[in-house]
UniProtKB/Swiss-Prot annotation:
Gene Ontology CC, one term: nucleoplasm
Self-association and partners: Interacts (via N-terminus) with xrn-2; the interaction is direct.
Biological source species: Caenorhabditis elegans
Protein name, as recorded: Partner of xrn-2 protein 1
Phenotype upon gene inactivation: At 26 degrees Celsius 80% of progeny arrest at the L1 stage of larval development. Reduced xrn-2 levels.
Region feature Disordered, mapped onto this chain: 95-119
Lineage of origin: Eukaryota, Metazoa, Ecdysozoa, Nematoda, Chromadorea
Keyword Ligase: no
Domain XRN2-binding (XTBD) stretches: 7-91
Length: 335
C-alpha cells in the first residue's frame, strides 16, 4: 500500500470534508517523520487546535503549530488535494482561520464556541482507545506508574496524580479518570489508584462524560471506579480459587495475581479480646472478634484460615458486589 492509500484509509465517517483534507495534508507532510500511531494522534491534535480552538500545554501547542505551519487544503482542490512537504511546511506561517473556505471568521468563532464538544469528544474517545492499545503492549514487568508514563507519552496525553491526605485523584489531559478516598491503613494509596486505573482502562470501554468532565469506564462515575475495579478483580480469580487451597496462603496468592495484597489487621478491644480483620486493596474481606482464649498465634492462624475459606466461598458464589464504605480498617466493603 502506497503512502497516499495508507493515509486515505485513516478517514473517519464522522469527519467533515474540510477537517479531513487538513488532517490528510498534515499526515502526508509528516508521513515519514513519525510512527503511525503517533502521527494519528498528532494529526487529530492539529485539527483540534486549528478548527476547534482546543488548548493544550504550551510545549505541545508550539509543536503542533510548527508542524502545521503552511499546511492547508487547496480551495480549488481536485480529488487528490494539494499538499506541502514537511520540509517546506516547517518554514511557513501557521494557517489562519480566514484561510479556510466556508463561513466568515465571526460565524466560525460563534460555531466553535457553541458546538465543539461532539467532534472533540469523539476524538478524545478515539484517543482513549489508542491509550488502551498502547497500555496492552507495554511490558508488564514495569511498575504501574512506568506503564502509564510509557503509554500516555506514546499517545501524546498528559496524566497527573493529585494526592490530598488519603484522597487520590488522577486526571488524563483535562478529564478526571479516578477519584477515591482511602483509609489511613492503606499502605500505598497512590500505587493502588494507578493499578486500578490501568485495570479499568484495559478491562472496560472508556468514554468521556462531558457534563462532569470525567472519563467513565463502562459508564461508571469516577467515585465508584475503585469499587468496581476491585469487584472485577475478585471475579477474575474465581477459576484459581475453585482449583486451589482455601487458606490464607492460597487466598493471598490469588489476590497477588491481580495486584491486591492481603494483610491481617488486629485491634485490641476491652479486656483481652481482639478484632481480626482480613483486608486487601483497602477492602474489608472478613472480620471477627476473638475471645481471650483465641488470641494465641496458633489459634489466630486457624481462625484466619477459616475466614479465608469463607471469603473463597463468597467469591465462588458469584454474589460479590463491592461498595464504598469507610470502615475502621478499610474504605471498601461487601454490600
Amino acid at each position: 500500500m502506497g503512502k497516499l492509500e495508507d493515509v486515505e484509509a485513516e478517514k473517519k465517517l464522522w469527519e467533515s470534508d474540510d477537517a479531513w483534507e487538513l488532517r490528510k495534508a498534515f499526515m502526508l507532510a509528516h508521513y515519514d517523520d513519525y510512527p503511525k500511531i503517533q502521527l494519528q494522534c498528532l494529526s487529530q491534535l492539529f485539527i483540534n487546535v486549528t478548527l476547534l480552538g482546543c488548548e493544550y500545554s504550551q510545549t505541545l501547542m508550539q509543536k503542533i503549530r510548527t508542524m502545521g505551519a503552511g499546511i492547508a487544503a487547496n480551495k480549488d482542490r481536485t480529488k487528490t488535494g494539494s499538499y506541502v512537504k514537511a520540509s517546506a511546511a516547517k518554514k511557513r506561517q501557521a494557517v489562519k482561520t480566514s484561510d479556510l473556505e466556508g463561513a466568515s471568521d465571526e460565524s466560525k468563532k460563534v460555531k466553535m464556541e457553541k458546538s465543539p464538544s461532539p467532534v472533540a469528544r469523539e476524538s478524545f474517545d478515539e484517543r482513549l482507545g489508542k491509550l488502551k492499545a498502547s497500555l496492552a503492549m507495554t511490558p508488564h514487568h514495569l511498575t504501574g506508574e512506568q506503564m502509564m508514563k510509557t503509554a500516555t507519552n506514546s499517545c501524546l496525553m498528559k496524566w497527573h496524580v493529585n494526592k490530598i491526605n488519603q484522597k487520590i485523584e488522577i486526571t488524563i489531559d483535562r478529564y478526571v479518570a479516578f477519584r477515591h478516598t482511602f483509609s489511613q491503613y492503606c499502605v500505598d494509596p497512590r500505587d493502588c489508584a494507578i493499578n486500578t486505573l490501568i485495570e479499568s482502562i484495559l478491562s472496560c470501554d472508556a468514554a468521556v462524560h462531558e457534563e462532569s468532565y470525567e472519563i467513565r469506564f463502562d459508564g461508571v462515575p469516577v467515585d465508584e471506579c475503585y469499587a468496581k475495579s476491585v469487584t472485577r478483580r475478585l471475579a477474575k480469580i474465581k477459576s484459581a480459587v475453585s482449583n486451589g487451597a482455601h487458606t490464607v496462603k492460597g487466598l493471598t496468592t490469588y489476590l497477588d495475581a491481580v495486584n491486591m495484597s492481603m494483610i491481617q489487621n488486629t485491634q485490641k478491644l476491652e479486656g483481652w479480646s481482639q478484632q481480626l480483620d482480613l483486608v486487601t486493596a483497602d477492602l474489608l474481606l472478613s472480620s471477627r472478634v476473638l475471645s481471650s482464649t483465641e488470641c494465641t498465634k496458633p489459634a489466630m492462624a486457624t481462625i484466619a484460615n477459616q475466614m479465608s475459606e469463607d471469603v473463597c466461598q463468597l467469591i465462588l458464589n458469584d454474589k460479590i458486589n463491592v461498595i464504598n464504605s469507610m470502615k475502621s480498617h478499610s474504605s471498601l466493603a461487601f454490600q
